[in-house]
């Protein structure tokens, strides 16, 4: 049997539960994943003066072929996107600017420094998201930025953040797709602080200054991202979960939840329904924390599937902005993008092929036996045949056949880079 014939057979299994598989694939095709550019060069960026990676972030490995400039990074993204079904967005950090060899400090970045990214996105029908890069810089060397006691340093990062929001607005206007601009800072202390309130007050005041500048939400949406701890900030993080949840709620901006930014016993899948009750939209950075915020490549595991189910069963595909955030320099970077992105989409498909209404009904009835039994039986339903057809329909490789393309690209392109 060919892919289409297997699909038609598998469809019948789901139709028994009232699931319209053709409609599911049409809906899935509307979902845009925000694919992070920084997997392609190990979070180095293209500033004229290169700074060492900091902010408690680590990218381990020395697999050959990392992109050395924006042109190479776009070429690598082109290859990865040709292996991922659907039309998506690309997420940029401020350090991925292009300045023709001129030094431009972070607080001086302008839309023109990202014109090539916009041109490329237009040509490929992509949207762009953005992030100020508030780490890996001399003015973040002591681990404090927007909460720094030194007003000059705070003001520098305030200017950078405002400039970043204006770039987000530029992306939205040029591409006709709303840009999400996300603020994350590494601020915190290695050991027990003697003042927890002061840095948080300064952070609040800095954010107030940043968001005082009015930008049309049609073009740019703002969000803030918390973290439980980082390397070098084990004892105290200024931008904690409680801080940002309150700040976002009070100021009518979005919260972004990174799956690696919580205590290891906490899961984002359990947080989504609470957020969706109170927030119009929620943003995600889907990662894979191994014992800490290690940013491993996203795999098709239980938590990823549960996150997708929470989005789908709560009818929130248009309310949850899904971004990826991982970086692994120990494996082929095109493969890393492909694996993580395909897994995220696969998890959404799995959620959409789940009899959510029936399972909800069983829970309301208190029929926990049948609920568990049905959940378990659906784990071996023929979703793989649906997935393969979805890939074929989107003109991307079916099954593991994409690996061959990555190997050829490595041989022809990546291996020739120093």
UniProtKB/Swiss-Prot annotation:
One of its GO terms (cellular component) is cytoplasm. Its main location: cytoplasm. Pathway: Carbohydrate degradation; L-rhamnose degradation; glycerone phosphate from L-rhamnose: step 1/3. GO terms for biological process: L-lyxose metabolic process; rhamnose catabolic process. Its cofactor is Mn(2+). Belongs to the rhamnose isomerase family. This is L-rhamnose isomerase. The gene is rhaA.
